Amino acid sequence: MNREEMHCDVVKI
């Protein structure tokens, strides 16, 4: 899991 992927999750919510 990359930091950008986590960012995507945060933006998704």
From Swiss-Prot:
Domain of life of the source: Bacteria
Disulfide bonds: none
Residues of the signal peptide: none
Induction: A fusion of the 5' UTR and initial codons of the gene with lacZ allows expression of beta-galactosidase, suggesting this protein is expressed (at protein level).
Pfam families: PssL
Protein function: May serve a regulatory role in expression of downstream gene pssA; in a pssL-pssA-lacZ fusion, mutation of the start codon of pssA to a stop codon in pssL decreases expression of beta-galactosidase, suggesting translation of the 2 genes is coupled.
Note: This gene lies upstream of and overlaps pssA on the same strand in another reading frame.
Protein name per the record: Protein PssL
Gene: pssL
